[in-house]
């Protein structure tokens, strides 16, 4: 589709071109896919045609997002997203928990590894109903929400605002009322 539409690919040497990356997030169990077009430009020509071409080839596609990253940097994603079609996230379900995962949020890519981490949490921490858990750098809440089903309260902290927003949504998706999520660095959020 890129060749067909002749979208100029980004050249990091001189900063020319529009398309920096194409990022695909796919749910391991849900099989939903989100395509993120990382561009140096806020608008792309023939974007509807591009979306239609991709949708025909990827039936599991649930959304296409344009991410703006105009800076000459090795950071992949910029801060600003706009939905070109569909959803701005995928939904994944792991260990009976539903997770809303957006373009800029961190989520464990190795789901079987995440399930093993859950087993280790149970084995080594032996969470109890009276416990209060702090999840520093919680991302979308994958560990925090797992623990929230077992303990009195969970507090999650992350400096990525998109991840915190997803964590709050995920807590609601799973009907968990014993969670608090805070945006900021751990060093600034926690009292010394």
Regions found by a protein language model. Name each.
Residues 12-16, 111:
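Conserved phosphate/pyrophosphate-binding and hydrolysis machinery centered on Walker-type P-loop NTPases
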Residues 46-48, 52-56, 60-192:
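Rossmann-like S-adenosyl-L-methionine
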Residues 1-11, 29, 44:
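Extended interfacial segments that mediate partner engagement and assembly in macromolecular machines
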Residues 28-31, 60:
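Short flexible coil/turn linkers enriched for glycine and charged/polar residues
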Residues 24, 31-40, 98-102:
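Short, aliphatic-rich beta-strand segments
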Residues 15-29:
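Short edge beta-strands and adjacent turn/loop segments
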């Amino acid at each position: 589709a890129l060749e067909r539409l002749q979208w100029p690919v980004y050249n990091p040497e001189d900063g020319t071109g529009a398309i920096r990356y194409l990022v695909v997030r796919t749910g391991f169990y849900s099989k939903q896919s989100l395509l993120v077009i990382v561009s140096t430009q806020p608008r792309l020509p023939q974007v509807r045609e591009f979306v239609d071409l991709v949708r025909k080839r990827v039936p599991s596609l649930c959304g296409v997002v344009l991410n703006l990253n105009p800076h000459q940097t090795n950071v992949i994603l910029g801060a600003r997203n706009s939905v070109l079609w569909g959803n701005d996230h995928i939904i994944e379900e792991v260990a009976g928990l539903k997770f809303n995962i957006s373009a800029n949020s961190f989520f464990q890519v190795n789901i079987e590894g995440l399930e093993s981490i859950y087993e280790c949490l149970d084995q080594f921490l032996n969470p109890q109903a009276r416990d209060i858990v702090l999840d520093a750098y919680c991302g979308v809440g994958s560990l925090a929400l797992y623990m929230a089903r077992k303990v009195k309260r969970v507090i999650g902290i992350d400096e990525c605002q998109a991840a915190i927003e997803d964590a709050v949504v995920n807590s609601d998706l799973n009907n968990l009322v014993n969670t608090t999520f805070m945006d900021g660095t751990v060093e600034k959020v926690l009292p010394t």
